[in-house]
Amino acid sequence: MKLSIAMIVKNEEKNLEKSLKEICKYDFDIVIVDTGSTDKTKEVALKYTKNVFEYKWCNDFAKARNFSISKAKGDYILVIDADEVIESIDINNLKTLINKNNNKVGRILRINQYSRNGERFTYKERVNRLFKKDKFKYSGRIHEQVTEINNKSYDTYNVPIVLNHYGYEKN
């Protein structure tokens, strides 16, 4: 079983390296799709993978995500954003769960980090991010969601992946 990380980015040079350093600790195929960065995002990405592609932004997050998935070599896709950092993955348990649930969508635990009035807060949520490449896709121009390719309903399961999300933090 091969797992690919699919990531879309734009002007993420400040976040991307931290995310990729953690991803590179695992044997994943990494695909990064740049949707029009004007900073050094692409240069940072190329330090970690040769699978960096340009995509002309068309105001549709699902299309960009699906393009990234189309470039992935793995049978399974794990979607991670540039402002998310892997805190933990139980690889052995993950492989077992994927094999048992290959027609379902895996829900990772995302810990959103943010500050307000000098105080730090976190908010935990489960998000659909792990799925079989040939069974699922993204739909929705904004607030894109994982959908079954034939638009059938699907079940989910929790996977042993924890991501810290720093996108709500002020730089």
Give the ranges of each region predicted by the language model:
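Extreme N-terminal starter segment of soluble prokaryotic enzymes
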Residues: 1-4
